[in-house]
Amino acid sequence: MDYSLLFIVIFLLGFGLIMVYSTSSYNANMQFDGDSAWYFRKQLWATILGIAVMFFVANIPYHFWEPFAVPAYIVSVVLILLIIPFGHESHGATRWLRIAGVSLQPAEVAKLGMILFLASMICSMGKGIRSRKGFYTVLVVPVPIALMLWKITDNVSSAIIVMGIAVLMLFVSCPDYKRFLLLGLLAIAAAALLVFIIVKSSESGGEVGGFRGERILAWLDPEAYASGKGFQTLQGLYAIGSGGILGKGLGASKQKLGFIPEAQNDMIFSIICEELGLFGAIAVILMFIILIWRFMVIANNAPDLFGALLVVGVLGHIAIQVILNIAVVTNTIPNTGISLPFISYGGTSVLFLLIEIGLVLSVAKGIRLKDL
């Protein structure tokens, strides 16, 4: 068992529970007849279940899961498609399924399924991955799931993460810098063109991109959309700015008192900045950096390519999600609606993140057994 990794994860989970209670107690008190711990309890039970599943997965040899790669991909597709007739709406988005009274977010299943499927696929291709056909075959595999997440669930952030996981796993198995440089330049050019079209359309009185177009315009000038799409961003920036170096103190945030909607979700990092200041924000970022470093150490020493790719996939998932969340909160990129791993409120998210950590711990355990 990699106790360094385990300690970091347990620390982030404990800190997350504290911040979930701090950020949600006001809203819970107003919504649930004075029950200020309502969100905290739900997150606590999800965390306990997740830890139990994590240890279960960690003690199973990771190669046990390889035959389930194709079924995992198929299940991911089916669950996303089931949102069309059976989707459960929450906070203005239809991204959940209700199963036996429990909400399940298929996007989280899809991320795990994609990691497992691509790791198995790349290993089975062998040296064929280095050919142009093999390279683009792997790159195309996540596209259907990414498109479904985007169009069916309006979840652009999860679509970006799924594609990001694929690109990172592909880069590790086939480090052809020219191809990746070309892909990166094309992605940047496409994003810049989209922003240019939306801005020009807005200047001429037109409308392009619907609510996503509004989000981009609000990102460029949040004060001009202070009563609409820019409201949450501005309130988050006020929270960050008012925290100073050491913060106002744990539980002393004013922005969580109805100013930042659902502060325990995507914008929880802004409350961390307000209550714990720059010091607390840097401490959280450092913990994620150490976590990613441990992933890199384990991947570099993995017993085989399949184990290394599993760890790289989990690394990509968590790293991209952390970067996107902090970038959104600080208004570095448009609002995409993405949670902060292990810290934001969300039972499905923490459960599947801990399953992924279980896979990483299983690979780490394989390293120790190999060295004996």
Regions from the PLM with identified roles:
Residues N155-I160, K248-S253, A263-N265, I282, ...:
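Transmembrane helix boundary and interhelical junction motifs in multipass membrane proteins
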Residues P142-S157, A239-Q255:
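Membrane-helix interface and discontinuous TM-entry motifs in multi-pass inner-membrane proteins
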Residues I240-F279:
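Long extracytoplasmic/lumenal interhelical loops at the membrane interface
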Residues L6-G14, S22, F32-K229, S270-V328, ...:
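Hydrophobic alpha-helical transmembrane segments of multi-pass inner membrane proteins, especially
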Residues Q321-L372:
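A juxtamembrane structural motif centered on a specific transmembrane helix
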